[in-house]
Every structure is written in structure tokens, then in C-alpha cells.
């Protein structure tokens, strides 16, 4: 065991079970540990405020139990400028962004990393993400978490090897039930707390209500692939490719009894295009073009290569061939067609356990 007693780690404490156990595991490994609670959003209603206050109280209770200090910092301005405004712009353009990926890129592994190093004198930061770090030839790799159900490498693909090298991910070596068991043994208040779901700044609220506050909804027609108007949508931003629920056109059927799915968004004309059946050709893609690329090793691509890709979280890995088009764009060809490839979402690439990096889906390629 290397001597960690001179190394200071700041753990991002969210008030959840994963970050709680992260702090404990690092203590066990001999590090000097302190916590940091980040406030990334200025709440605008009582329910949100209560939820944030509970999270802070839980984080404080865990730190008290472990005998470590808890610092707090307000990153709401950085969050608004670097995550939220971009999120709204993407929705306005008819795309479906992933704010969690942006939050990791701009806040947790940038603002937090800088604050921990510069203001708190940290050697490392740590988070409760289910990923692993592997150091090879003085470069750090990002690996999938041991628990395949919980692996979060999809959300961390923008990290550089330098950022990975400054980060510790102890729960990535464990399965989730084991993490809960440790928390229960320690009698931490977060042991039975349910995992947070949804986008960090929306919490458990209805997404539609939230978006409607910031973007004016523009109703328009829902049109089938055959050109028939089958209903009205309340705003393209409320819909995503492959969506089935919430279209309000259940009774309308073509010749088949299959349910309707969103297969396209015509932003220029404010038309939502639908078709019946989850394997309708208009829903399937043979590949994609991705941009805003981030490779963990930060090396440029030299030519085509084989790997696997995920076009959304928790998807099965898809074997594919990646071909560089220029420095910031790649073409990806799947071995088999894939449903509901969604512009604005991220395509993340893997070689076995290693997360290579990824990019934003600019367009899908169809036959």
C-alpha cells in the first residue's frame, strides 16, 4: 500500500449514498478526506428548496459521523452560464441535450476540480461515480464501473486523462448493493435514500412544466410519415425521437394496430413526424455523424478504427466503425441498424472496458 496519509482528497458530497461511501472508503485508504457540497442551482420554489436543504443536511450528517469537515460552495452562476443556457439553446434548436454530461464537464471536473486544488489545497477530488481509473504508462484511462447496471462512464466521456489522473472513484470498484450494505453497517443517514433521478436542476418536477417556464411553447401539427395530420403537439421541445407516450393520438390508427412513435422533428416547419411501430424504417439509423469530440487520451485520430458505441445511457454496446471526417467530426457506421439515434445526445465509444471518449450526435444516417 502506498502511503496516502499526506494526500488530501476533497469528495463531492451530494447527500446521496454513493458519495457518502466514497468518503468512507478513502478514509479507510488512509487519505486526508474532506467533503464539498456544491450548490449549482438557485431554487425557485419551496419543494426544490426543501430537497436541496435535505441533501445538504444529509451530507453534513454523514461528514459529522465520519469526523470530516464539510465545505460548501455556490457554483450556480457557472452552472447557469455553462450548462443551463446551452441546454436551453439545444432545445430551441430541436435537439435533445444531456445536461448531466455538461455538468460533469463544466462543473464537477472543472469548477470543482479548480476550487478543490486552488482554494482547499487538494491533491485529488473524488466523486461517487461508478467508473474506474487505470494508470498506464503515466497516462490515466477511464474504465467502466464494475457494476454493469450502474456504470456511469457514458456521462464522463468528456474528461481528459489529466482530469482522470486528478480524480478518485472508489465505488466504481464495487457493485451497488455492496455500497448500500457498507452505508447500512456504518448507520449513515443516506443508507436507504433512493437514488436521485432526472436532471439535477429539475429534480422530480414535471419536465414539461419546467421547460415551459423558460421557453415559450409553440404548438403545431403532428403528421404521419404518409403526410396525414393526426394530431397537435404542444411544442417540439417536449418530444424526443423514439418517444411513444404523451403524444395524445392513441385512438388514431393507420391500417396497423401498432402504437405511434416520434420518428422526426421538422424544426423549420414546427412539425412532429410520427409513424407506427418501434422498428419503423424512419426510426432506424445505419450510422451517425458526431462533432464536439473529446477523446480521453486527447490524441487525434489517425484513421478508421473498430470499437463499440452507445448512443444513449444504458444501451447495449453497438459494434461499429469510426472514420474521422476532419478534426472535429467523425462518421460512425453501425454493424446493425439502431433505433432512435437522437441529435444532441452523446455517442460514447468503448474498447472493451476502456471508455475512449465521444461526441455530440449532429445527424443520424439513414438508408
Swiss-Prot record:
One of its GO terms (cellular component) is cytoplasm. Disulfide bonds join 103-200. Its main location: cytoplasm. It comes from the Bacteria. ATP binds at residues 12-19, 38, 128. CDD domains: MnmA_TRMU-like. It is an enzyme of class 2 (transferase). One of its GO terms (molecular function) is tRNA binding. The active site is at 103 (nucleophile), 200 (cysteine persulfide intermediate). Residues 150-152, 312-313 are annotated as: Interaction with tRNA. It is found in: Cytoplasm. Residues 98-100 are annotated as: Interaction with target base in tRNA. Keywords: ATP-binding, Cytoplasm, Disulfide bond, Nucleotide-binding, RNA-binding, Transferase, tRNA processing, tRNA-binding. Catalyzes the 2-thiolation of uridine at the wobble position (U34) of tRNA(Lys), tRNA(Glu) and tRNA(Gln), leading to the formation of s(2)U34, the first step of tRNA-mnm(5)s(2)U34 synthesis. Sulfur is provided by IscS, via a sulfur-relay system. Binds ATP and its substrate tRNAs. PANTHER family: MITOCHONDRIAL TRNA-SPECIFIC 2-THIOURIDYLASE 1, TRNA 5-METHYLAMINOMETHYL-2-THIOURIDYLATE -METHYLTRANSFERASE. Belongs to the MnmA/TRMU family. This is tRNA-specific 2-thiouridylase MnmA. It comes from Serratia proteamaculans (strain 568).
Amino acid at each position: 500500500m502506498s502511503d496516502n496519509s499526506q494526500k488530501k482528497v476533497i469528495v463531492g458530497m451530494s447527500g446521496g449514498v454513493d458519495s457518502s461511501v466514497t468518503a468512507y472508503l478513502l478514509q479507510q485508504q488512509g487519505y486526508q478526506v474532506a467533503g464539498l457540497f456544491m450548490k449549482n442551482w438557485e431554487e425557485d420554489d419551496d419543494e426544490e428548496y426543501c430537497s436541496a436543504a435535505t441533501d445538504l443536511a444529509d451530507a453534513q450528517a454523514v461528514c459529522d459521523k465520519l469526523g470530516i469537515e464539510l465545505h460548501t460552495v455556490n457554483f450556480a452562476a457557472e452552472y447557469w452560464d455553462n450548462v443551463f443556457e446551452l441546454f436551453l439553446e439545444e432545445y430551441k434548436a430541436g435537439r435533445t441535450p444531456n445536461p448531466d454530461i455538461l455538468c460533469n464537464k463544466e462543473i464537477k471536473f472543472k469548477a470543482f476540480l479548480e476550487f478543490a486544488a486552488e482554494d482547499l489545497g487538494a491533491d485529488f477530488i473524488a466523486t461517487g461515480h461508478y467508473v474506474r481509473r487505470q494508470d498506464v504508462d503515466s497516462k490515466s484511462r477511464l474504465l467502466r464501473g464494475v457494476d454493469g447496471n450502474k456504470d456511469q462512464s457514458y456521462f464522463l466521456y468528456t474528461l481528459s486523462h489529466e482530469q482522470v489522473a486528478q480524480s478518485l472513484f472508489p465505488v466504481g470498484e464495487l457493485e451497488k448493493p455492496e455500497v448500500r450494505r457498507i452505508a447500512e453497517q456504518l448507520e449513515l443517514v443516506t443508507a436507504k435514500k433512493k437514488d436521485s433521478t432526472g436532471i439535477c436542476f429539475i429534480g422530480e418536477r414535471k419536465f414539461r412544466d419546467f421547460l415551459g417556464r423558460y421557453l415559450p411553447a409553440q404548438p403545431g401539427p403532428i403528421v404521419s410519415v404518409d403526410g396525414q395530420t393526426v394530431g397537435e403537439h404542444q411544442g417540439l421541445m417536449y418530444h424526443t425521437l423514439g418517444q411513444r407516450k404523451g403524444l395524445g393520438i392513441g385512438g388514431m390508427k393507420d391500417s396497423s394496430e401498432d402504437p405511434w412513435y416520434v420518428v422526426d422533428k421538422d424544426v423549420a416547419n414546427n412539425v412532429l413526424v410520427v409513424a407506427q411501430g418501434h422498428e419503423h424504417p424512419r426510426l432506424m439509423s445505419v450510422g451517425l455523424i458526431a462533432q464536439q469530440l473529446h477523446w480521453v487520451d486527447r490524441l487525434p485520430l489517425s484513421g478508421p478504427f473498430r470499437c463499440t458505441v452507445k448512443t444513449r445511457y444504458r444501451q447495449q454496446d453497438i459494434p461499429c466503425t469510426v472514420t474521422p471526417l476532419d478534426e472535429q467530426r467523425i462518421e460512425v457506421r453501425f454493424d446493425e441498424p439502431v433505433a432512435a439515434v437522437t441529435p444532441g445526445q452523446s455517442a460514447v465509444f468503448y474498447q472493451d472496458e476502456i471508455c475512449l471518449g465521444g461526441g455530440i450526435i449532429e445527424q443520424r444516417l439513414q438508408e
